[in-house]
Amino acid sequence: MPSRRRGPSRQQLSRSALPSIQTLVGGGCGNGTGLRNRNGSAIGLPVPPTTALITPGPVRHCQIPDLPVDGSLFFEFLFFIYLLIVLFIQYINIYKTVWWYPYNHPASCTSLNFHLIDYYLAAFITVMLARRLVWALISEATKAGAASMVHYTALILARLVLLTLCGWVLCWTLVNLFRSHSVLNLLFLGYPFGVYVPLYCFHQDSRAHLLLTDYVVQHQAVEDAASNVGSLTRSKDFLSLLLESLKEQFNNSTPIPTHSCPLSPDLIRNEVECLKADFNHRIKDVLFNSLFSAYYVAFLPLCFVKSTQYYDMRWSCEHLIMVWINAFVMLTTQLLPSKYCDLLHKSAAHLGKWQKLEHGFYSNAPQHIWSENTIWPQGVLVRHSRCLYRAMGPYNVAVPSDGSHARFYFLFHRPLRVLNLLILIEGSVIIYQLYSLLRSEKWNHTLSMALVLFCNYYVLFKLLRDRIVLGRAYSYPSTATDSRQTKLPLSSEGELR
């Protein structure tokens, strides 16, 4: 028989047609699970480094305009006026006259039972509410400086007179309250201070960590700052911690940090930690001051009402909740301005996010071992702490198992999330107050809703103005923050090649 020319064998076809293993899996064999044989053991092959396959695009940030923000003194003045208005409303809800009084009764000639009001308590509450305004006034006068010795002396004397007057009024009201009320009622006067001490005095280390670095770009600056951790976070006695916390509490002009668009993953994580500590401190200030204001404005007057005095408990408690929500929104708007939220958004864009995957999925996809010195692109699979994760952001330097990094990215990767939440809260309050105003039949309900609505309209106007301007600003195409990121790739150690 004539011999046929046989073609290449199946084994030769598979060897010549299929690409190399290194091309299929890239850097996965050396940095992850790689390929495995039938026995389950990994096949060790020389593969290129992980960063040869990682080319994340540059992080792009939008440029937002500088929106006007109320000054510290102006905001404290408006906030103090608002608290006085809601305090007056609460006294109307408690001490309004009722219809069953006889005509010849003294209270029937007036709208309020003025003879039942404790004026010492009202003066004490007013002084406590004015503490931030007084300190803001002193701080602004101190920042202005003194042009001459006479001006400096007058400034010192005015500060001394103002603080002495506030202290004297506070002591005078406390002495008279001690004479006319029981010890149980007087305990309500200092209850917020009992919450203040453990809340602020025992958590100063995280605040001191914020002062380690001002978001520097160079590695050497971070190393120098890290060497000073011991000196900044050394143990202090209780009195010094209390004085520092009180100083921070009264100091309302908290500076806004800056964003440096760092290239190193360590610097990005360090910036996120500093911003996270600063954000937690601001939220703590917002919660404490809003609860403090609502407590002294709406709750403390109820504690000193005589047992024979009738008032609408449901309406007074509803007023308490409204005061707390409005104070929370006002303080949040002041302490978390649009520039600060944009700073958090930029840092979250550099941080990235990891999604945890179930075992068994993506078993044939290339996987890598997570490295803290690598910037991971979107969609890459890594293994960390015996778990599989997938990169979700354009840049990903977050620790996959760190829940605080995931929460930070969730809150701030959308720049308008905080602003939309505040608008939703304030809008819901205004809609409910309008509904209550339409349904109200008593004069005190109508007056209280009308006065509070005027204050809420101003807050909602500022929020909607910022939302419209920022919404249009973020809709424009982003610009690359640093052209060096597109020209100089990163090595496996996080440095420029």
UniProtKB/Swiss-Prot annotation:
GO terms for biological process: autophagy; negative regulation of autophagosome assembly; negative regulation of autophagosome maturation; positive regulation of viral genome replication. Disulfide bonds: none annotated. It is a multi-pass membrane protein. It comes from the Eukaryota. It is found in: Endoplasmic reticulum membrane. The keyword Transcription does not apply. Glycans are attached at residues 31, 39, 251. The chain crosses the membrane at residues 72-92, 110-130, 155-175, 182-202, 285-305, 317-337, 418-438, 444-464. Pfam families: Tmp39. Keywords: Autophagy, Endoplasmic reticulum, Glycoprotein, Membrane, Transmembrane, Transmembrane helix. One of its GO terms (cellular component) is endoplasmic reticulum membrane. Regulates autophagy by controlling the spatial distribution and levels of the intracellular phosphatidylinositol 4-phosphate (PtdIns(4)P) pools. Modulates (PtdIns(4)P) levels by regulating the ER-to-Golgi trafficking of the phosphatidylinositide phosphatase SACM1L. Interacts with SACM1L, SEC23A and SEC24A. Belongs to the TMEM39 family. This is Transmembrane protein 39A. The gene is Tmem39a.
